[in-house]
A protein has these predicted regions:
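Canonical P-loop GTPase G-domain recognition
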Residues: 1-7, 137-182
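Conserved G1/Walker A P-loop phosphate-binding module
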Residues: 1-74, 180-181
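Switch II of P-loop NTPase G domains
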Residues: 8-12, 46-54, 68-98, 106-120
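Short, glycine/charged-enriched secondary-structure capping and boundary segments
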Residues: 13-15, 34, 77-80, 115-119, ...
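Structured catalytic cores of enzymes that bind and process phosphorylated ligands/cofactors
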Residues: 17-31, 53-54, 60-61, 99, ...
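Hydrophobic aliphatic residues
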Residues: 34-38, 91, 154, 175
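Conserved protein kinase catalytic core
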Residues: 39, 72-75, 111, 139-140, ...
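Conserved C-terminal guanine-recognition region of P-loop GTPase G domains, centered on the G4
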Residues: 85-156
Length: 182
């Protein structure tokens, strides 16, 4: 289900796991890998392809929520501002949001917009994990350097590769732990 306005968000109150990150960090590839469905979320080499909030129902039990990427995208500023507003409305009002997965490209590390989002989540007490994608594109020393740089912000990132599937089990563990009744 795609939602371009808050009134289009699901109303069935199922728990939600949101995937947030800059344009082209691999959010859709991560979703496809976790869901085990290659074409679930549309992937593209062109930044800014995800332009609505997409809700994917998983086993009838919860939603994966694919949010538009922030940052670089070849679209008019008006569209970027609309996406920003939509994302903010979702994050501010999502009562069933159980976990935010903040996605970083392991080759690039933190950008100011990522740090702003991290602070925003922390200030509101929203649980989150940081996932470092595109791990397969780095050699061993680059992987270590990238992880160290991400850790400097006080978080332990979960490395992930959509090509090899590395890290999928750990991400699923974080998700299922969050969804477990307390």
């Amino acid at each position: 289900m795609s939602a371009g306005k808050p009134e289009m968000f699901p109303s069935d109150r199922l728990p939600e796991i949101a995937f947030l990150g800059r344009s082209n960090v691999g959010k859709s590839s991560l979703l496809n890998s976790l869901a085990g469905k290659k074409g679930l979320a549309f992937t593209s080499n062109t930044p800014g392809r995800t332009q609505t909030i997409n809700f994917y129902r998983v086993d009838g039990a919860f939603y994966f929520v694919d949010l538009p990427g922030y940052g670089y995208a070849r679209v008019p500023l008006r569209h970027k501002l609309e996406w920003k507003k939509l994302i903010e409305q979702y994050l501010e009002n999502a009562e069933t949001l159980k976990l935010s997965c903040l996605i970083l490209d392991a080759r690039r590390g933190w950008m100011d917009t990522d740090l702003d989002l991290k602070r925003w989540l922390e200030e509101r007490g929203r649980p989150y994990v940081v996932i470092a994608t595109k791990f397969d594109k780095l050699n061993q020393s680059e992987q270590e350097r990238g992880m160290r740089a991400i850790r400097e912000e006080g978080v332990e990132p979960l490395p992930f590769s959509a090509i090899t599937g590395r890290g999928a089990r750990e991400i699923w563990q974080a998700i299922t732990t969050t969804l477990r009744p307390r």
